[in-house]
């Protein structure tokens, strides 16, 4: 620890810290633009100037390391004059367009100019003007406002792992650009909007829509992947205006994937707002009571063993739990959350979780990806891995044909035999696994989505056992889930498989990706919020609330339960999920024993310990899985996905459709250059 004096007070701080960090620790307010705690230091805005005794000039505190005995002053006349001068230079070419700038009201330059500026203007020459750059359908640019802090460049390089933004020219001619002015090839590009301290980079879908003070803020959870990123839903009246990240150091830090951030406009289109019944081959709008009576009559006419329920990819735990209780009361145990027929082992909870945890990745020194596309399945997790790789703290190897993950990977091949050789210790990489202190394996849908998934998983468990990856001080076995509701469904006992043969009544709770050809003879009830495949195949449609219109628990891939709060009202005549299921039970004269959301959560916490620990990770058991299934000779490969359209909300998002089109155009442009 190093002792130093700041404004007359002595503090201690760890060696290697900067003067800026010491000042913040001492409770001092230091203005800054280029500095960001999660980015490399640039030191080019000069706004954080402080006075250090024995130094002839003010010093940029963000770039100066502390040393023993330093005496620092943060509020002297020299410091004040220096900051006023820096602010004056920053404003020389900055346009006075705050009234039409989307950053107005939440702009660092506005705030700091008011607090630290002179309040007068001595510059009477012409301001420079810069042509706006194209960065895709998500980011709107106004580069004349840019103050060259280079935050966006550093985020692209260090966090996103794409070297597609940089600065050209020098001095007053410097410009930040994407070089070829293409759509940015990143799943987390929207974070550049958040870290831009001025209005140079703004959200294109949100442009000219609202001001910060008009919005209501609601804490929620991103449901478009299984990471459980913490989000803030900003709404006005009953319309969602934008979605921003909330800080959670254990999960998403302060970053957010583009899909979770921008696909909210999908909540406006193709919504189900009234119940429907199929009559003479056509869906006809009916009352809720008629829909419930039709369901009651049909359920009473079907044997319990012929009834099945399938939960979709963005359904809350409470809704699944209510549906499970209803089916059990009817005498059926045929319910699943696995509409994709994934081969998932549920022997113990640790067998289907990301046990290392998202933040735990930063402790690993060797990572093996098997059939996993972390970049598109879990962009925030992938960013953490990439940062560790780029500083040389983590080595990543891969089995399976894969995509560019934005960091260096050593490919071992795509043959099943590689896993077999690792399991018996004859592979050339055996030594590296033995020497690694904290090795980890990430198993993706390229394994559990195979027909022989159980056999491959059994083989991977042998590798885990061989190199002692699951022990008291380290859990290195990880399943990379790609849907928000899977872990929660498995936690409450939903099955991993379902028998479609002989089903006479199928209850689809937001499920749109099942093989509908196997349900041709079944009566289908669809409870959901979008008119997608499930609704089009249904005999009865029950319009439900989306995740933004009801409160619900979601368990992320590492097994952490979190609550998504209700932000806006339901659309039309739609109802919340648990209310619909409760009313069906009422028509059937079945007592579920829970009348409201609070009672559902109390019962969940009593029956499953994990739900008594919201926002926490519980200790989980892991057991070696053995399968006698036969291995196929098919190569291992991560399943191809359309990242921007993976559920009913993102599929109905105009913004996501524009992203798909823009990335296809980018591929065509690249093909023209190389072919």
Swiss-Prot record:
Any one GO biological process: ATP synthesis coupled electron transport
GO molecular function: 2 iron, 2 sulfur cluster binding; 4 iron, 4 sulfur cluster binding; metal ion binding; NADH dehydrogenase (ubiquinone) activity; quinone binding
Residue span, 4Fe-4S His(Cys)3-ligated-type domain: 78-117
Domain 4Fe-4S Mo/W bis-MGD-type: 215-271
GO cellular component: membrane
Catalytically driven reaction(s): a quinone + NADH + 5 H(+)(in) = a quinol + NAD(+) + 4 H(+)(out)
Keyword Metal-binding: yes
Enzyme class: translocase
Positions contributing to [4Fe-4S] cluster 2 binding: 146, 149, 152, 196
Taxonomy, superkingdom: Bacteria
Alphabetical list of InterPro entries matching this protein: 2Fe-2S_ferredoxin-like_sf, 2Fe-2S_ferredoxin-type, Mopterin_OxRdtase, Mopterin_OxRdtase_4Fe-4S_dom, NADH_UbQ_OxRdtase_75kDa_su_CS, NADH_UbQ_OxRdtase_ferredoxin, NADH_UbQ_OxRdtase_Gsu, NADH_UbQ_OxRdtase_Gsu_4Fe4S-bd
SUPFAM superfamilies named in the record: 2Fe-2S ferredoxin-like, 4Fe-4S ferredoxins, Formate dehydrogenase/DMSO reductase, domains 1-3
Note describing how the cofactor binds: Binds 1 [2Fe-2S] cluster per subunit.
Domain 2Fe-2S ferredoxin-type span(s) in chain numbering: 1-78
Binding-site positions, [2Fe-2S] cluster: 34, 45, 48, 62
Residue ranges that the Swiss-Prot or TrEMBL entry lists as coiled coil: none
A Pfam family assignment: Molybdopterin
EC number assigned by the record: 7.1.1.-
Gene3D superfamilies: 3.10.20.740, 3.30.200.210, 3.30.70.20, 3.40.50.740
Binding residues annotated for [4Fe-4S] cluster 1, in chain numbering: 94, 98, 101, 107
NCBIfam families (UniProt xref): NuoG (TIGR01973)
Family: Belongs to the complex I 75 kDa subunit family.
Its job: NDH-1 shuttles electrons from NADH, via FMN and iron-sulfur (Fe-S) centers, to quinones in the respiratory chain. Couples the redox reaction to proton translocation (for every two electrons transferred, four hydrogen ions are translocated across the cytoplasmic membrane), and thus conserves the redox energy in a proton gradient.
Name this protein carries in UniProt: NADH-quinone oxidoreductase subunit G
UniProt source species: Rickettsia prowazekii (strain Madrid E)
């Amino acid at each position: 620890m190093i002792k130093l004096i700041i404004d007359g007070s002595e503090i201690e701080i760890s060696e290697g810290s900067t003067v800026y960090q010491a000042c913040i620790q001492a409770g001092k307010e230091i203005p800054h633009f280029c500095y960001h705690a999660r980015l490399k230091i640039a030191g080019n805005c000069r706004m954080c100037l402080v006075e250090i005794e024995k130094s002839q000039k003010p010093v940029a505190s963000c770039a100066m390391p502390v040393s023993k005995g330093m005496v620092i002053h943060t509020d002297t006349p020299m410091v004040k004059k220096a900051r006023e001068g820096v602010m004056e230079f920053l404003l020389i070419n900055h346009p006075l367009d705050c009234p039409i700038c989307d950053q107005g009201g939440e702009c660092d330059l506005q705030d700091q100019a008011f607090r630290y500026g002179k309040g007068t203007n001595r510059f009477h020459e012409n301001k420079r003007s810069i042509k706006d750059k194209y960065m895709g359908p998500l980011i709107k640019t106004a580069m004349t406002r840019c103050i060259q802090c280079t935050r966006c460049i550093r985020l692209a390089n260090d966090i996103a792992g794409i070297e597609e933004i940089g600065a050209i020219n020098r001095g007053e001619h410097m410009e930040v650009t994407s070089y070829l002015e293409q759509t940015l090839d990143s799943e987390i590009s929207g974070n550049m909007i958040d870290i831009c301290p001025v209005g140079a980079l703004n959200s294109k879908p949100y442009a000219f829509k609202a001001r910060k003070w008009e919005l209501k803020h609601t804490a929620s959870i991103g449901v478009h992947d299984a990471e459980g990123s913490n989000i803030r839903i900003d709404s006005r009246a009953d319309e969602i205006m934008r979605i921003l990240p909330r800080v959670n150091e254990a999960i998403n830090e302060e970053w957010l994937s583009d899909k979770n951030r921008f696909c909210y406009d999908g909540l406006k289109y193709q919504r189900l707002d009234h119940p429907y019944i199929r009559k003479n081959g056509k869906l006809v709008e009916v009352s809720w009571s008629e829909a419930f009576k039709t369901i009651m009559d049909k359920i009473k006419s079907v044997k319990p063993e012929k009834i099945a329920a399938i939960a979709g990819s963005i359904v809350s735990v409470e809704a699944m739990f209510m549906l499970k209780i209803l089916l059990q009361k009817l005498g059926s145990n045929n319910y699943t959350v696995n509409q994709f027929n994934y081969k998932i082992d549920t022997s113990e909870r640790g067998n289907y979780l990301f046990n290392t945890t998202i933040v735990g990745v930063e402790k690993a020194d060797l990572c093996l990806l098997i059939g996993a596309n972390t970049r598109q399945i879990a962009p925030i997790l992938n960013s953490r891995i990439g940062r560790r790789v780029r500083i040389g703290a983590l080595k990543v190897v891969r089995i399976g044909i894969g995509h560019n993950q934005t960091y260096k990977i050593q490919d071992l091949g795509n043959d099943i035999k590689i896993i077999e050789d690792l399991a018996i210790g004859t592979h050339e990489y055996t030594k590296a696994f033995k020497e690694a202190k904290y090795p980890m394996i990430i198993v993706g849908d390229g394994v559990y989505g195979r027909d022989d998934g159980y056999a491959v998983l059994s083989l991977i468990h042998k590798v885990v056992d061989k190199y002692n990856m699951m022990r008291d001080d380290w859990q290195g076995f990880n399943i990379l889930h790609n849907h928000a509701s899977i872990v929660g469904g498995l936690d409450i006992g939903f099955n991993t498989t379902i028998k479609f043969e002989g089903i006479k009544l199928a209850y689809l709770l937001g499920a749109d990706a099942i093989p509908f050809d196997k349900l041709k003879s079944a009566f289908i009830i669809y409870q959901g919020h979008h008119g997608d495949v499930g609704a089009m195949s249904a005999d009865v449609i029950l319009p439900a609330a989306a995740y933004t219109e009801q409160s619900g628990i979601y368990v992320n891939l590492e097994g952490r339960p979190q609550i998504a709060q209700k932000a806006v009202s339901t659309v039309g005549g739609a109802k919340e999920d648990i209310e619909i299921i409760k009313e069906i039970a009422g028509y059937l004269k079945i007592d579920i024993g829970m009348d409201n959301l609070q009672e559902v959560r109390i019962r969940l916490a009593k029956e499953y310990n994990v739900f008594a620990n919201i926002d926490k990770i519980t200790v989980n058991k892991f057991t070696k899985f053995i399968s006698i299934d036969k291995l196929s000779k098919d190569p291992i490969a991560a399943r191809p996905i359309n990242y921007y359209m993976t559920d009913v909300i993102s599929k109905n998002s105009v913004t996501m459709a524009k992203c798909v089109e823009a990335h296809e155009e980018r591929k065509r442009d690249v093909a023209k250059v190389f072919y």
